């Protein structure tokens, strides 16, 4: 096969698909473009949750909870609580170390891409994981009372899926002035297939697409673009996808996913067919390594068959 398979990822669904795709195409043929609009600077660290999540999945470090590093300790968080610091964002010690090193590199003038590449190499990541851009882009959520930074909305305010204040608006501050990195543009142009992972379309994939020039780069690509639905039996497996789709005026269904990506994708992988779009009907629940590999393999085959 020529050219990489490019996966757009944010959150657990995209990371799982990336891990399955690694088994299918190998380390030299996989590039993951990760959402960085969830990034947060806290405790002196620069934390990039989605970028790190993908890296932890690819290196088989992911904790069974679905976030953080397996076997990590929380001594620093315990120490902060002991001196009455408001620890609302929980980070394991190894996870924090990565964020501190990223912050150090950024303070010394490295691009976000350069900083994460160095960290990925140190962790022996077997594929390329690229931030969507080097400039800061931040997701904000507006409720009735105020605008919230995304992490604060999800954790402190409870998030819509957990009974928190309903979403009234979402924006991606900085996206209009940000640009895809040269590395991202090269990967997209060279790709043999581009896959939008089964991530929350409104808050995980939309920030990537909102970066100025990203959608045009994808449109100009010669590769077919396939989205994998995050829904199983027309329902959300976990997380706030339903709440954000409802905010966006979309039905929580595969037709809603197809409508959201209308004009961008060439096909949809889902467990129930949609109308008016080439679709591959298959089980998209990726709860085992075998399932992750199967979904990745079938998705890639579908993309290549549409060329």
Regions flagged by a language model, labelled:
Residues 168-188:
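Active-site glycine-rich loop that binds ribose-phosphate moieties when present
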Residues 16-29:
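A short, Lys/Arg-enriched amphipathic alpha-helix followed by its capping loop at the start of a domain
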Residues 191-192:
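An anion/phosphate-binding loop that grips the pyrophosphate of nucleotide cofactors and donors
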Residues 237-307:
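C-terminal functional extensions of proteins
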Residues 34-172:
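Electropositive, gly/pro-rich neighborhoods at or near active sites that engage anionic ligands
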Residues 1-6:
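Extreme N-terminal starter segment of soluble prokaryotic enzymes
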Residues 207-215:
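Charged helix-capping and loop-helix junction motifs
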């Amino acid at each position: 096969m020529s050219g990489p398979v490019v996966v757009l990822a944010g959150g657990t669904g995209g990371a799982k698909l990336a891990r399955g795709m690694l088994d299918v195409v190998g380390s030299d043929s996989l590039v993951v473009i990760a959402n960085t609009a969830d990034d947060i600077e806290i405790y002196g660290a620069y934390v990039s949750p989605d970028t790190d999540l993908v890296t932890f999945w690819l290196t088989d470090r992911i904790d069974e909870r679905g976030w953080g590093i397996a076997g990590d300790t929380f001594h620093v968080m315990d120490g902060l609580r002991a001196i009455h610091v408001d620890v609302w964002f929980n980070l394991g010690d190894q996870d924090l170390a990565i964020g501190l090193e990223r912050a150090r590199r950024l303070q010394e003038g490295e691009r976000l891409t350069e900083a994460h590449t160095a960290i990925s190499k140190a962790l022996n990541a077997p594929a390329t994981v690229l931030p969507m851009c080097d400039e800061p882009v931040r997701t904000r959520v507006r409720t009735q009372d105020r605008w919230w930074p995304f992490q604060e909305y999800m954790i402190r305010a409870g998030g819509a899926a957990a009974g928190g204040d309903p979403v009234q608006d979402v924006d991606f501050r900085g996206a209009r002035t940000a640009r895809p990195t040269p590395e991202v543009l090269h990967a997209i142009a060279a790709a043999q297939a581009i896959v939008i992972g089964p991530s929350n379309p409104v808050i995980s994939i939309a920030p990537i697409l909102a970066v100025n020039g990203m959608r045009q780069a994808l449109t100009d690509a010669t590769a077919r673009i396939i989205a994998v639905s995050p829904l199983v039996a027309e329902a959300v497996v976990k997380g706030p996808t339903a709440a954000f789709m409802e905010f966006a005026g979309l039905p929580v269904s595969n037709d809603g996913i197809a409508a959201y990506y209308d004009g961008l994708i060439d096909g949809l992988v889902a467990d129930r067919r949609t109308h008016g779009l080439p679709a591959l009907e298959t089980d998209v629940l990726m709860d085992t390594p075998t399932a992750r590999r199967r979904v990745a393999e079938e998705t890639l085959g579908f993309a290549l068959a549409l060329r």
